[in-house]
Regions:
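Conserved G1/Walker A P-loop phosphate-binding module
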Residues: 1-94
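Conserved short-loop catalytic and cofactor-binding motifs
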Residues: 15, 34, 38, 73, ...
Length: 205
């Protein structure tokens, strides 16, 4: 139809990857607008692959929250959590590499090595920017990362207060493949109410 700019519908899976305690679960909850994934200062709180669904006018996004990838996973549970995280990109159309400002650690580099093995577009999400008192310090930090890591975009967030979410969501939608929504408009997750209740109890422990 000439004369009309018809925006195509988009659908895809977006995996949140990162080392423990960078704010992946807080980010997932902020993106879908509901407390779905456990938030705790304790490491390795996320033990399962959690799917959160965000539905907008022209796009539906299935976000995958994953356990934090970490080095030295010698315990059986830690090895299992690492396996869950490592397989998350297998079902993703877009990746979000979440890090916590203002540090790039060996574990962040480990996550990047997993990402670069896949031919999947990836955005770098620098969370917790409120911890950086002098924001001018972010520029050399990001420049040092960009020299050796090819991301399709970089976003600065304070997920606890929702800062930077709109720009991130717009960039995610831009990278999604065209497709129709898979879930109902009011669906927030594929997990059962029983599972979510158990997770809420575990968050309080």
């Amino acid at each position: 139809m000439s004369g009309f700019d018809v925006q195509p519908s988009r659908f895809g899976h977006v995996a949140l990857l990162g080392r423990p305690n960078v704010g992946k679960s807080t980010l997932l909850n902020a993106l879908i607008g509901a407390d779905l994934s456990i938030v705790s200062p304790k490491p390795q709180t996320t033990r399962h692959r959690i799917l959160g669904i965000a539905t907008h006018e022209h796009a539906q996004i299935a976000f995958l929250d994953t356990p934090g990838l970490h080095e030295g996973g010698k315990r059986a549970m830690n090895r299992q959590l690492n396996r869950v995280a490592r397989h998350a990109p297998d079902e993703a159309d877009v990746l979000l590499h979440v890090i916590a400002a203002p540090r790039w650690t060996d574990e962040d580099e480990q996550v990047w090595k997993l990402i670069e093995q896949r031919d999947i577009p990836c955005l770098l999400v620098i969370n917790k920017i409120d911890l950086v008192k002098d924001k001018s310090d972010l520029l050399p930090f990001v420049e040092s990362i960009s020299k050796h890591h090819a991301y399709q975009g970089i976003h600065y967030l304070q997920a606890t207060r929702g800062k930077g979410l709109k720009a991130l969501m717009n960039d995610v939608v831009r990278l999604l493949p065209e497709g129709q929504a898979v879930y109902a408009e009011d669906d927030l997750t594929d997990r059962s109410a029983r599972f979510l209740a158990a997770e809420m109890i575990r968050e309080q422990l």
